[in-house]
UniProtKB/Swiss-Prot annotation:
Quaternary structure and partners: Heterotrimer of A, B and C subunits.
E.C. designation(s): 6.3.5.-
Domain of life assignment: Bacteria
Naturally occurring in which organism (per UniProt): Nostoc punctiforme (strain ATCC 29133 / PCC 73102)
InterPro entries attached to this UniProt entry: Asn/Gln-tRNA_amidoTrfase_suB/E (IPR017959), Asn/Gln-tRNA_Trfase_suB/E_cat (IPR006075), Asn/Gln_amidotransferase (IPR018027), Asn/Gln_tRNA_amidoTrase-B-like (IPR003789), GatB (IPR004413), GatB_C_1 (IPR042114), GatB_Yqey_C_2 (IPR023168), Gln-tRNA_amidoTrfase_suB_CS (IPR017958)
UniProt similarity note: Belongs to the GatB/GatE family. GatB subfamily.
Alphabetized PANTHER family for the sequence: GLUTAMYL-TRNA GLN AMIDOTRANSFERASE SUBUNIT B MITOCHONDRIAL AND PROKARYOTIC PET112-RELATED (PTHR11659), GLUTAMYL-TRNA(GLN) AMIDOTRANSFERASE SUBUNIT B, MITOCHONDRIAL (PTHR11659:SF0)
GO molecular function annotation: asparaginyl-tRNA synthase (glutamine-hydrolyzing) activity; ATP binding; glutaminyl-tRNA synthase (glutamine-hydrolyzing) activity
Name of the protein described by the UniProt record: Aspartyl/glutamyl-tRNA(Asn/Gln) amidotransferase subunit B
Biological role stated in the UniProt entry: Allows the formation of correctly charged Asn-tRNA(Asn) or Gln-tRNA(Gln) through the transamidation of misacylated Asp-tRNA(Asn) or Glu-tRNA(Gln) in organisms which lack either or both of asparaginyl-tRNA or glutaminyl-tRNA synthetases. The reaction takes place in the presence of glutamine and ATP through an activated phospho-Asp-tRNA(Asn) or phospho-Glu-tRNA(Gln).
Keyword tags: ATP-binding, Ligase, Nucleotide-binding, Protein biosynthesis
Record has Calcium as a keyword: no
An example Gene Ontology biological process: glutaminyl-tRNAGln biosynthesis via transamidation
Origin organism lineage: Bacteria, Bacillati, Cyanobacteriota, Cyanophyceae, Nostocales
Endpoints of the signal sequence: none
Length: 491
């Protein structure tokens, strides 16, 4: 894991994240237009998301379900009664000149999630980060600036309204984060959770997960917050960490130089690896919120709440704790296995089929992971079933095949060949009466090496073991072979 940039000890950073997460519904939040990514510009639009006169929004019930499930997964209090509000501002990507959002009565609030940081020795430490609120809203359109990645410097701008009306939840953290590393881990854990829930794909490159950072610095020991600066335009977790680390140093340098920190929005410039001023930050009063008159208040019944709660899967943090405390896995292995729900399910199916948990973890996080990375595949795309992986591990542990044989046959196994077929005729020779004559034959055939060994070159033991394995096409049991070779050489 990336380590954090060292911050001068006389200052501390106060960091909070506002995360916009697109929900994976088939249609938009208030209309029936598709939410599919990558469509031609302005093809997934309709009168509602374009704000044409005379049309009325209707809430997509799936959006409410996904928002409540996310709130429950984040340990939030779910509001039995909430409402939508109009957030008013004027920008080309907002066709109605207002955004339907939630203001004073969000669907969920007062939650938390736990982040886990692993040090260089592999020891985990955990920290609880508060969640202020989670609310539903509609996304805006997307501006494309010709000749620049921002309005300034572009010759003209185009607007794609396909994104307008796509459902979002905005998740606002408490200012409990203290470094770029903590913030990046918080965002990663948030993505793991929404992916486990199946409510979002969390794809930062496609804009499904967008994080804005609020950051200030203050002298250690001071209770008052410094002036808050917002940072936008970070499209990866590493960019979040680098942007925060840069901004911490920038603000500290400004304070020490006697400059005033102004409340503003700054843009992270990936190429230059710096933040630059974008606009003076607006306050909430600038948006002139008022209740949305075209949508009825939202009521969540006890039955809905309990049904949705019962459908929650075991979440990443719960799985990590289970893997470490009950299965004896390392913090690193538990983290890798729970990074993706399909990998965790593959692992759990393998151990349910009889695989040793540590052996299964090693195979999945090492050999299988290497294959997935090389071929750019997911674990659901390989033909090696978790049941067959369990059988392979059992064959190794019972001495029927060696670990080396299994690794050699892994490409065949990954392509769908069964363990029975892959290891046919390759069972290990474990009978000493069969293996001993072969060892005698190898030693007799190499008198010069035998003499060198007995004159002190004990490293040649590996040579004799290798010759036995070669002569038996690697079918000789490695442990038994080592024992017999050592016994014969020292006779």
């Amino acid at each position: 894991m990336t380590t954090a940039t060292t911050v001068k000890t006389e200052y501390e950073a106060i960091i909070g994240l506002e995360t916009h997460c697109q929900l994976s519904t088939k249609t938009k939040i208030f209309s029936n237009s598709s939410t599919a990514f990558g469509a031609d510009p302005n093809t997934n639009i309709d009168p509602v998301c374009m704000g044409l006169p005379g049309v009325l929004p209707v809430l997509n019930e799936k959006v409410l379900e996904y928002a409540v499930k996310t709130g429950l997964a984040l340990n939030c209090q779910i509001a039995r009664y909430s409402k939508f509000d109009r957030k008013q501002y004027f920008y080309p990507d907002l066709p109605k000149n207002y955004q339907i959002s939630q203001y004073d009565l969000p669907i969920a609030e007062h939650g938390w999630l736990e982040i886990e940081l692993v040090d260089a020795e592999g020891n985990p430490s955990r920290k609880r980060i508060g969640i202020t609120r989670l609310h539903m809203e509609e996304d805006a359109g997307k501006l494309v600036h010709a000749g620049s990645d921002r309005l300034s410097g572009s010759s003209y701008s185009l607007v794609d309204y396909n994104r307008a009306g796509i459902p979002l939840v905005e998740i606002v953290s408490e200012p409990d984060l203290r470094s770029g590393l903590e913030a990046a881990e918080y965002a990663e854990e948030l993505r793991r959770i929404v992916r486990y829930l199946g409510v979002s794909d969390g794809n930062m490159q496609e804009g499904s997960l967008r994080c804005d950072v609020n950051i200030s610095v203050r002298p250690v020991g001071r209770k008052e917050f410094g002036t808050k600066v917002e940072i936008k335009n970070m499209n990866s977790f590493s960019a979040i960490q680098r942007a925060i680390d840069y901004e911490i140093e920038r603000q500290i340098a400004a304070i020490e130089a006697g400059d005033r920190i102004i409340q503003e929005t700054r843009l992270w410039e990936e190429g230059a690896q710096r933040t630059s001023s974008m606009r003076v930050k607006e306050g909430s009063s600038d948006y002139r919120y008022f209740p949305e008159p075209d949508l009825a208040p939202i009521e969540v019944s006890n039955e809905q709440l309990e049904n949705w709660r019962s459908e929650l899967p075991e979440l990443p943090a719960q799985k990590r704790h289970h893997y470490e405390s009950e299965l004896g896995l390392s913090a690193y292995d538990a983290r890798v296995l729970t990074e993706d729900r399909s990998i965790a399910e593959y692992f759990e199916t393998a151990i349910a089929s009889g695989a040793n948990p540590k052996a299964a973890a090693n195979w999945i996080t090492q050999d299988i992971a290497a294959h997935l990375n090389k071929q750019k595949l997911t674990i659901t795309q390989i033909e090696l079933t978790p049941t067959n992986l369990a059988e392979i591990i059992t064959r190794i542990e019972t001495g029927k095949i060696s670990n080396a044989q299994a690794k050699e046959k892994l490409p065949d196994l990954l392509s769908g060949i069964s363990p029975e077929k892959a290891f046919a005729g390759l069972e290990l020779i474990t009978d000493p009466t069969v293996l001993e004559p072969i060892v005698d034959e190898v030693i007799a055939a190499n008198p010069k090496e035998l003499e060198k060994y007995r004159n002190g070159n004990t490293n040649l033991k590996g040579f004799f073991v290798g010759q036995v394995l070669k002569k038996t096409a690697k079918r000789a049991d490695p442990k038994l072979t080592n024992e017999l070779v050592e016994k014969k050489l020292n006779a």
